[in-house]
A protein has these predicted regions:
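A short, conserved structural fragment
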Residues: 3-16
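Short, cationic-aromatic polyanion-contact patches
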Residues: 13-36
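Conserved phosphate/pyrophosphate-binding and hydrolysis machinery centered on Walker-type P-loop NTPases
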Residues: 20, 90, 134
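A conserved hydrophobic position in a structured secondary element of the catalytic/binding core
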Residues: 21, 92, 139
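A generic structural signal for short hydrophobic patches within well-formed alpha-helices
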Residues: 26-27, 97, 144
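Short, well-ordered secondary-structure micro-motifs
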Residues: 30-31, 57, 103, 128
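Short gly/ser-rich loop at a beta-strand->alpha-helix junction or flexible surface loop bordering the NTP-binding
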Residues: 37-122
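C-terminal regulatory/effector modules of DNA-binding transcriptional regulators
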Residues: 103-180
Length: 180
C-alpha cells in the first residue's frame, strides 16, 4: 500500500514516518474508482422536514446497533455547512432497511423524495462513522468520496470538508518538518 501511494506522490516519506500529501488529488482519484461500484439507493418521502428526519434517524440508530448513519450532504452539513440541501441522505445497513422505513414512516417514491437511503455495497461507509454533535455520520473521507460522486453542489461541499479536515501543508511546512 505504501509503495502504491509513494508512486503516485500521495505520501511524503521521511526516514521514520510518512504523511499523506496531494490529498485533493488522492480523493478525486479514489472517488472516481469508488463510484464505479454500485450501492443501492432508494428514494422515500416523509412529511417531516429534513432536519426532523435526520434527528429521527440518529435517535433510531442509537437503539439499533448504529444501523443508520447520515451520509452525503447530511454528513457534510455537520462537518462544514456550506451548501443547502433538500434530502436527508442516510446509509442503512441491509438487515435494518425494512424496519427503518417502517419506524420512520417513510413512503417509497420514484421521484421527488426527501429521503435517500443508501444500502452500502460493503461495510466501509459505516465502519468509520463518527459522532458529530451527537449524530452518527460517515467519516470525513467517506463523506468527501460520496459528495464527489454527486452531481450539482457535491464538489463544492467536498472541497469545504477537504479544506477543513485535510488541510494541505505548504512546501515551507514540509521543509521545516524535514529539517531543511
Amino acid at each position: 500500500m505504501k509503495s502504491f501511494l509513494l508512486a503516485r506522490d500521495w505520501i511524503d516519506k521521511s526516514t521514520t514516518e510518512f504523511r499523506l500529501q496531494n490529498i485533493r488529488e488522492l480523493f478525486y482519484t479514489w472517488a472516481k474508482d469508488y463510484h464505479q461500484k454500485e450501492a443501492r439507493k432508494l428514494q422515500f418521502y416523509s412529511l417531516d422536514t429534513v432536519p426532523e428526519i435526520e434527528q429521527s434517524a440518529a435517535e433510531w440508530s442509537k437503539t439499533h446497533d448504529n444501523g443508520a448513519i447520515l451520509g452525503g450532504f447530511s454528513a457534510a452539513a455537520r462537518y462544514a455547512p456550506t451548501v443547502r440541501y433538500q434530502k436527508a441522505e442516510i446509509y442503512v445497513e441491509p438487515q435494518f432497511v425494512q424496519e427503518f422505513v417502517k419506524d420512520l414512516e417513510l413512503q417509497p417514491v420514484n421521484t421527488g423524495g426527501n429521503v435517500v437511503i443508501t444500502i452500502p455495497h460493503d461495510e466501509t461507509p459505516c465502519m468509520y462513522a463518527k459522532p458529530v454533535h451527537d449524530t452518527l455520520v460517515t467519516s470525513p473521507a467517506q463523506t468527501v468520496i460520496d459528495l464527489l460522486g454527486d452531481a450539482g453542489r457535491g464538489e463544492e461541499a467536498a472541497e469545504a470538508i477537504l479544506r477543513r479536515e485535510y488541510p494541505e501543508r505548504t512546501e515551507d511546512e514540509r521543509r521545516t518538518e524535514k529539517g531543511n
